[in-house]
A protein has these predicted regions:
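N-terminal secretory targeting modules
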Residues: 1-79, 87, 91, 124, ...
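Acidic/histidine-rich helix-loop elements
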Residues: 41-55, 97-111, 139-145, 236
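Alpha-helix capping/helix-boundary segments
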Residues: 85-86, 203
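Short, solvent-exposed loop/turn elements at domain surfaces
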Residues: 86-92, 109-112
């Protein structure tokens, strides 16, 4: 708890420092949150048709799901499920020979993930699902959400998985940075660092209370300020090759811990 409070203080101090050190209205810089809010509104408007016609984006993996056979005996199936960070992760390079399945979709929030959890996870009969989400909920990609609403969605994902005998690994929400590229400040202002920390604290406790595995990317990827370490991302949000190199062994250890634990009930 003491470490969490120190991180929270450091992260909030960085928000203030970013605001104070930013020149008055330089090109491409959000001013009083206007440009950040404007870009989010543009994202929502640009995806309005998709939201109306296929909110969960069920078509994305429909054919791949239909072609997926039963798990190979003796090889527990593992699915990585989440948003763009999962979507861009080249699992075959990070986990050679493991045949892990990627079911990430860029930009998604937990309400969307709930819609597609059955076809993209449950029906594929994995032994383990590794879920990485939350950052787009905090940003408000599909509309404003309270922490309580996000937490409720996480709990629903866990309930669905466990009811179908699937072991759950909940990943921490990733740290972010505001000075790692032209889009970094926009991403930073859309994603409250204190909400990221609060959600991670809740996730860790929820996993402990319900017998799930907590995958702590945050501690390994945050610097002394509580922000994403330089060199692990090109835009302050999405990991690059170096970032995924940090994440892969942590994910593998979490998967092995989940498989070694009791069967989901």
């Amino acid at each position: 708890m003491k470490k969490s409070l120190v991180l929270a203080g450091a992260m909030l101090a960085c928000v203030a420092a970013a605001a104070q050190s930013t020149p008055a209205n330089p090109p491409g810089t959000p001013q009083d949150g206007y440009e950040s809010a404007h870009s989010l509104e543009m994202y929502r408007e640009g995806n309005a048709t998709m939201f109306m016609n296929d909110f969960g984006q069920l078509r994305r993996y429909h054919d791949a799901d239909a072609a997926m056979g039963a798990p190979t005996p003796g090889e527990p199936r593992v699915i990585f499920f989440g948003d763009s960070i999962t979507d861009i992760w080249k699992l075959d390079e990070s986990f050679p020979g493991k045949h892990y399945i990627n079911r990430g979709i860029g930009g998604q929030t937990t309400p969307q993930m709930l819609v597609r959890f059955r076809p993209d996870v449950i029906d594929l009969k994995p032994a383990v699902v590794v879920i990485l989400a939350g950052t787009n909920d905090i940003a408000g990609n599909t509309g404003p959400e309270t922490l309580e609403q996000i937490e409720s969605d996480y709990a629903s994902l866990a309930d669905l998985a466990r009811a179908n005998g699937i072991r759950v690994v909940f990943s921490s929400v990733m740290p972010i940075n505001y000075d790692s590229g032209p889009n970094a400040l926009k991403f930073f202002l859309q994603r409250s660092p204190d909400k990221i920390l609060a959600l991670d604290v809740w996730l860790k406790k929820y996993c402990a209370d319900h017998g799930l595995v907590y995958l702590d990317y945050f501690s390994a990827m945050a610097d002394e300020r509580g922000l994403l370490k330089r060199g692990l991302s090109e835009d302050g949000l999405h990991p690059n090759a170096a970032g995924f190199a940090v994440m892969a062994p942590l994910a593998q250890a979490a998967i092995e811990k989940a498989l070694a634990g009791p069967a989901a009930q």
